[in-house]
From Swiss-Prot:
Protein name (Swiss-Prot/TrEMBL): Small ribosomal subunit protein uS19
Domain of life: Bacteria
Keyword Metal-binding (UniProt): no
Originating organism: Alcanivorax borkumensis (strain ATCC 700651 / DSM 11573 / NCIMB 13689 / SK2)
Keywords per UniProt: Ribonucleoprotein, Ribosomal protein, RNA-binding, rRNA-binding
PROSITE patterns cross-referenced by the UniProt entry: RIBOSOMAL_S19
Molecular function terms, GO-annotated: rRNA binding; structural constituent of ribosome
Amino acid sequence: MPRSLKKGPFVDHHLLGKVEDAVEAGSRKPIKTWSRRSMIIPEMVGLTIAVYNGKQHVPVMVSEHMVGHKLGEFALTRNYRGHAVDKKAKR
């Protein structure tokens, strides 16, 4: 269920502070975060944010079409390798 428009987008305070610092400094260094629940806001466009997927930090280059989505949508947590193949049926 989507968040109410009157509440506005949710972004963790520590992440918002890091984003503002990176924008001021013009830094291209990835910002590490564990906050998959934070929404991408227009101030993040052009930054690289390393989002934790449970094992490692996945670098996500934020572009304009990502605004309004959550960071966790771009760092997959599951590794699907396909269904098991029956070797006898393959012959």
